[in-house]
Amino acid sequence: MLLFDQDELDYHFKQLFKFYRCKLSGFSFHTQKLVGTICINYLQNCYLNQEGEYREKAYELIDDLALIPDLGMFRIIKNYYKYWFNHDSIKYRSIRKFLIDNGLEEFVHRLP
C-alpha cells in the first residue's frame, strides 16, 4: 500500500534533505538510523515507480551518516541501488553475492 505518489515522495524527501544535509552525522544514532531507513525506502520507491528525481540526494545523505559499523549496512545497500540504477550489473551482483555469502538472503529478496 503506497501512502504517497512519487511527486509527494520527492517533495517530502527534498525537505528531509534540506534539513539534514552536511550535518547528519552530528545527530543521534536513532535519528541517523531513521534517516538512513527513509533513504533506502525512498530508493526502493524510485525502483518501484521507475522515477525519482532525488536519488543522488539519498546517496548523499547516506554518505553523511556517521562512519560506525551499526550504520554500515545503509552504505552497502545504497551502493547496491546506485549500481543497479546505473546498470552496473557486475558491481550490484557482487554486493548481492556478498550479502548471500554472509547469511543476509533476506536483504537480497527485497532488492531489485
Q: What role is predicted for each listed range?
A:
Residues 1-48:
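Mid-protein regulatory/catalytic core that forms ligand/cofactor-binding pockets
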Residues 37, 41-45, 74-84, 110-112:
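"A position-specific structural signal for the A-helix of alpha-solenoid helical repeats
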Residues 6, 49, 85-89:
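Structural motif corresponding to the intra-repeat A-B loop/turn of tetratricopeptide repeats
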Residues 33, 37, 52, 56, ...:
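Short, well-ordered coil↔helix boundary/capping segments
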Residues 9-23, 52-66, 89-100:
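Alpha-helical repeat scaffolds
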Residues 82-112:
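C-terminal non-catalytic interaction modules
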Residues 24-29, 66-76, 101-112:
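Boundary/linker segments of alpha-helical solenoid repeat arrays
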Residues 61-80, 84-88:
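Long C-terminal appendages of proteins
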